[in-house]
């Protein structure tokens, strides 16, 4: 009596489980017949957005199962286009419709987005190059504005050790005559002293009135007689 009660209690669960199994078998059997999609589904497929492969050039690189069906959801038409064979497509779709895009190996494996990593590295390199060029330009402008210390030191040395006027006594000038003045065409010390004496002696001022002891003769201009 007790086993009969147990069987009767399990009848609702059996009635709920059997239609689900029958429906899944019917879907798997009629999957190859659903090759042609409707107009709305085709438009949705043509205007679909890229998910994980948005950085890849999908128009130029051929698609594969890992990128089209494991990284994102794919349809039966996409799988058939990649595999190119009806038998392989049916086998793949039977397992793919049950497991879905994620597999056991993909769950344990950490995926690295290579394209995002490369994009970040390229952007960082471009910014480093731009900052380097800006720093080089700033250094050039600062160096142009700042005077060179070597040129200022040379100027102070020449100004300090080569005076424009050299004072000498007459004895030193006689004992050690300079050749630089002769080469430059400048007068010697004796010539300079003679010139200064000649120009410094001024003539006496003239006295007013006629000079004493001298007669002043006036010359008259007359026309000759005919």
From Swiss-Prot:
Residue stretches spanning the membrane: 114-134
Organism of origin: Mus musculus (Mouse)
Entry annotated with the keyword Zinc-finger: no
Membrane topology (Extracellular): 50-113
Keyword terms: Cell membrane, Cleavage on pair of basic residues, Disulfide bond, Gamma-carboxyglutamic acid, Membrane, Phosphoprotein, Signal, Transmembrane, Transmembrane helix
Function: May control axon guidance across the CNS. Prevents the delivery of ROBO1 at the cell surface and down-regulates its expression.
Signal peptide residue numbers: 1-17
Modification after translation: Gamma-carboxyglutamate residues are formed by vitamin K dependent carboxylation. These residues are essential for the binding of calcium.
Cellular localization per UniProt: Endoplasmic reticulum-Golgi intermediate compartment membrane; Cell membrane
MF terms in GO: calcium ion binding; WW domain binding
Residues cleaved off as propeptide: 18-49
Disulfide bonds: 69-74
Topology Cytoplasmic: residue spans: 135-226
Protein name: Transmembrane gamma-carboxyglutamic acid protein 4
Motif LPXY motif, residue numbers: 186-189
